[in-house]
Amino acid sequence: MDDFDRDLDNELEFSHKSTKGIKVHRTFESMNLKPDLLKGIYAYGFETPSAIQSRAIMQIISGRDTIAQAQSGTGKTATFSIGMLEVIDTKSKECQALILSPTRELAIQIQNVVKHLGDYMNIHTHACIGGKNVGEDVKKLQQGQQIVSGTPGRVIDVIKRRNLQTRNIKVLILDEADELFTKGFKEQIYEIYKHLPPSVQVVVVSATLPREVLEMTSKFTTDPVKILVKRDEISLSGIKQYYVQCEREDWKFDTLCDLYDNLTITQAVIFCNTKLKVNWLADQMKKQNFTVVAMHGDMKQDERDSIMNDFRRGNSRVLISTDVWARGIDVQQVSLVINYDLPTDKENYIHRIGRSGRFGRKGTAINLITKDDVVTLKEFEKYYSTKIKEMPMNINDIM
């Protein structure tokens, strides 16, 4: 794991009201963490805490309910993972921490981060996700898992089957909370919460926290500490954003092909709004002899895992996906995101383009728009206090 771009991370400003009185820890040593955890942090590649880590880790360790917001790629996963690992009793094999995520890929990724950070602590962790045989979960849970990372549907299933014992869970983490609190997951999260001990600590984490999400968190949290980014700081300053005006929807494909002839990139992600469009675009690109892979929520989990692993290893260069990939998935080499379709909601814009500038690295986002999209693009600019420029004629100037 590469280190952060310190200059970029230092630009992040937190709301004074929300962080008043919170001590900022400039080093991991000053947090007095377990020696084996500290060893795991350094082995993972961290040297000094990022802005969110320096503020939120100790709040989580203190046992307070915590609401933490920061940009994509600034180490949010490690923030709650470190806080959680510090309070785990390694002598007990009971489940003590539960992490809920909106996508299977994100749940697996979090499990991997926890595994690496807890490498020297002999931590047992399992990803509990749909799309796989529940028998595998039952077997793993019977062996004893101190930390479970999962998607709400499968987690509530194993709780109801009594395979996942909840009596010793100390901390519940809701990652990408804005997505989790949408209709599909809300009821499942309430259901899970009802099975947890009344004393459970709740940690809410997301890159964006709209007012309605903050209102919903009040049902789960008691006097939470809020570590929130200033509204005008919720932008990705390390990412250059452009748009290409296409007269009609069917001109987008030719524009995309033209872009590919000119761009020299390591890896790229192209986002479409529907599974149908993903399949169509992947087929069209392959007909033009472009090497691409496609991923969406209707695929079997094994197929999704295989595509993700290939993409992570760099075996495939271009991934076409729906928003299933936009949430928190960390592939270091991605330097370009193309929105073939603009996202249907403002919150997903930052999640999508954040894939191109992980951990402070520079990235580029290109939006293909028709005249019908102009108003939406202007709304995104206003919402994120950012400027999306028209792409210059010479594409190499922007890469």
UniProtKB/Swiss-Prot annotation:
CDD domains according to UniProt: SF2_C_DEAD
Keyword Zinc attributed: no
InterPro entries: DEAD/DEAH_box_helicase_dom (IPR011545), Helicase_ATP-bd (IPR014001), Helicase_C-like (IPR001650), P-loop_NTPase (IPR027417), RNA-helicase_DEAD-box_CS (IPR000629), RNA_helicase_DEAD_Q_motif (IPR014014)
Subcellular location: Nucleus, Nucleolus
Catalytic activity: ATP + H2O = ADP + phosphate + H(+)
Stretches assigned to the Helicase ATP-binding domain: 57-227
EC number, UniProt record: 3.6.4.13
Pfam families: DEAD, Helicase_C
Record's function text: ATP-dependent RNA helicase involved in 40S ribosomal subunit biogenesis. Required for the processing and cleavage of 35S pre-rRNA at sites A0, A1, and A2, leading to mature 18S rRNA.
Name of the protein in its database record: ATP-dependent RNA helicase FAL1
Provenance organism: Candida albicans (strain SC5314 / ATCC MYA-2876)
